[in-house]
Curated annotation (Swiss-Prot):
GO molecular function: actin filament binding
SUPFAM superfamilies associated with the record: Arp2/3 complex 16 kDa subunit ARPC5
The keyword Nucleus belongs to this UniProt entry's keyword annotation: yes
PANTHER family attached to this UniProt entry: ARP2/3 COMPLEX 16 KD SUBUNIT P16-ARC (PTHR12644)
Gene source species: Xenopus laevis (African clawed frog)
Keyword terms of this UniProt record: Actin-binding, Cell projection, Cytoplasm, Cytoskeleton, Nucleus
Protein name: Actin-related protein 2/3 complex subunit 5-B
A GO CC term attached to the entry: cytoplasm
Compartment list: Cytoplasm, Cytoskeleton; Cell projection; Nucleus
Keyword Nucleus among record annotations: yes
GO BP term (any one): cell migration
Pfam families: P16-Arc
């Protein structure tokens, strides 16, 4: 009998390393060390100055959609919810009209995320936002939000 058959070196080879169908997560690249999302101080300042439309656009800018950083996502959700609840009901339509189709989808994602964790009076306000966003984005916007893998 040969001496090589008693060896167990073959068990140390990772055969999955050579599989061409192996799943590789693209998100594994280095994430930035600083938290992503809108600048909370800037958004708060704009709200205090009464520039709600600029605060709205600033809050939706740089959303951590592709990030796995849950802290940044929750922080951004809180900022967006604060901006959405600051609007008066007659100003909502004007704000929604400033968004492109991707912005409408992003807004709908934040609306549905707000429905998941309701606060004091947020559901009524979010329903108003949902109504106005639905008029512009249509049913396709809802379907895209509910089937999207990129969460906020």
């Amino acid at each position: 009998m040969a001496k090589n058959t008693l060896s167990s070196r073959f068990r140390k080879v990772d055969i999955d390393e050579y599989d061409e169908n192996k799943f590789v997560d693209d998100q594994l690249q280095e994430e930035p060390a600083e938290p992503q999302g809108p600048d909370e101080a800037e958004v708060d300042s704009l709200i205090r100055q009464g520039e709600l439309l600029r605060a709205f656009q600033s809050a939706l800018r740089n959303s951590p959609v592709n990030s796995k950083n849950q802290v940044a996502k929750e922080r951004t959700q809180a900022i967006v919810l604060k901006v959405l609840t600051s609007f008066k009901s007659n100003e909502i339509e004007k704000a929604v009209n400033t968004l492109d189709p991707n912005g409408i989808d992003l807004l709908m994602k934040y609306i549905y995320k707000g429905f998941e964790k309701p606060t004091e009076n947020s559901s009524a306000i979010l329903l108003q936002w949902h109504e106005k966003a639905f008029v512009i984005g249509g049913l396709g916007s809802i379907v895209r939000v509910l089937t999207s893998r990129k969460t906020v």
